């Protein structure tokens, strides 16, 4: 059984669909908070709504700062799923170049790296995301802050040249 949502609108047919497994786990995390932390449960559900709205709208180009807000929403959802395991350092919008991308172009590879890391390492994860000044790419640095002996990982995310220029090819 495929655990991806079919019918996702996308400007790029190769873009990553949203994982049903991810959505179900976020809903389970929110459900676990309803009685003990209802405000946190509401926040998780609001973030999930924002996440799905960003990813499932028809094909379009978005500013890089909007995509990074989407990455921030994603990291909050993962923090709800894995309390205490993920620490994220994301650039502020004022530190970003004025590049553009498609929805999920940055978030999907970040999610792949985070999921791989959390699956392979039992400790906490520190994710630091940095953008190149020219807007051509970003770099995700993943490491385990509590165990410096664990080798870190770097993931380079190259933005599609057509979207950097502000349009689809």
Model-based region annotation:
Residues 165-169:
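C-terminal end segment of the histidine kinase catalytic
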